[in-house]
């Protein structure tokens, strides 16, 4: 009998894209709040959700640098358990409750893709990069801030 939490199944279950839960996560995150055309935001909503009339197209874009683990084996295969993710959240209403709906998520790791699919997230494979700086200054280290605040 073939085994595994996700596909591909194998005799010992080791070929699966992701191990079974529970999964534990840690990340760095950058979020950008923005307002878009309310009709464009409404076009992403599935049946059962309505636009939030108070939000006027409010949305959030998040960029995450994740590490996750299931059976404490991330140190054996760090590439399997580290990934980047970018997602969009738009304001909506479910019945009379304000919620945020996630129409798009991009990840750069197939294990993260499979974990998301098992929980109903609309993940797709993509490439996600963030500008970063380094402690050692130089032309390749992007400045964190160009100018100090003058008071």
Task: Report the location of each language-model feature.
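Internal, well-folded beta-alpha domain core
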Residues: 97-151
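A generic structural signal for solvent-exposed, polar alpha-helical segments
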Residues: 11, 18, 29, 89, ...
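Hydrophobic, proline/glycine-rich low-complexity stretches
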Residues: 1-72, 80-82
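Surface-exposed beta-strand edges and their flanking turn/coil or helix-capping segments
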Residues: 45-47, 74-76, 114-120
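Extended, compositionally biased
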Residues: 58-101, 105-107
């Amino acid at each position: 009998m073939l085994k595994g939490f996700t596909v591909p199944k194998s005799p010992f279950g080791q070929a699966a894209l992701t191990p079974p839960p529970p999964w534990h996560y840690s990340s760095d995150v950058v979020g950008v709040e923005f307002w878009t055309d309310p009709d464009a935001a409404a076009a992403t909503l599935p049946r059962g959700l309505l636009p939030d009339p108070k939000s006027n197209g409010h949305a959030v874009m998040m960029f995450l640098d994740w590490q996750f683990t299931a059976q404490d084996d991330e140190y054996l295969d760090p590439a399997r358990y580290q990934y980047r993710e970018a997602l969009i959240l738009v304001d909506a209403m479910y019945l009379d409750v304000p919620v945020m709906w996630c129409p798009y998520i991009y990840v750069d790791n197939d294990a993260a893709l499979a974990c998301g699919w098992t929980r109903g997230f609309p993940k797709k494979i993509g490439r996600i990069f963030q500008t970063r700086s380094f402690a050692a200054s130089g032309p390749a280290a992007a400045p964190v801030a160009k100018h100090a605040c003058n008071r």
